[in-house]
Amino acid sequence: MRIMGLDVGSKTVGVAISDPLGWTAQGVETIQIDENRKQFGYDRVKELVLEYEVEKVVVGLPKNMNNTIGPRAESSKIYAEVLESRIGLPVVLWDERLTTSAAERTLIEADVSRKKRKEVIDKLAAVMILQSYLDTTN
């Protein structure tokens, strides 16, 4: 069963997909979105769901360090609800505290240029979110 992981930001959505056995996560792409224009990438996510025969989606929930839900987490919850209604598959919210920071550190340690980091950070964060989910549920 393939599972999709999403890191939803204000400008991009990082996408990762599990292997068919649900053990490992691989980055797929970064979808550009525009909250001001109400363009959220739902259609592209649905295309990827069909292409990879995804059965479940995990959306990162960026809780505050004190476990409260802030504005960014509220946006992620709404995104997950709308996505679930559009694709007709279960969508799970998963605590993603510090994944973007961890992704940035990983890329810096790998000596990836700032420009390239900007291009791949959300995809790597999606991989980390999905891998955390897979490690916990398998």
From Swiss-Prot:
| Repressor keyword on record | no
Kindly name one Pfam family recorded for this protein.
RuvX
Got a GO cellular component term for this one? cytosol
Q: Which UniProt keywords apply?
A: Cytoplasm, Hydrolase, Nuclease, Ribosome biogenesis
Compartment(s)? Cytoplasm
Q: Which E.C. number(s) belong to this protein?
A: 3.1.-.-
| Entries under InterPro entries matching the protein | RNaseH-like_sf, YqgF, YqgF/RNaseH-like_dom, YqgF/RNaseH-like_dom_sf
Q: Name one GO molecular function term.
A: nuclease activity
| Main enzyme class | hydrolase
GO terms of biological process kind: rRNA 5'-end processing
Q: Does the keyword Transmembrane helix apply?
A: no
The family classification in the record reads:
Belongs to the YqgF nuclease family.
Task of the protein: Could be a nuclease involved in processing of the 5'-end of pre-16S rRNA.
Q: Which HAMAP family match?
A: Nuclease_YqgF (MF_00651)
User: What is this protein's name?
Assistant: Putative pre-16S rRNA nuclease
Organism whose genome encodes this protein: Listeria monocytogenes serotype 4b (strain CLIP80459)
Q: What taxonomic lineage is listed for the species of origin?
A: Bacteria, Bacillati, Bacillota, Bacilli, Bacillales
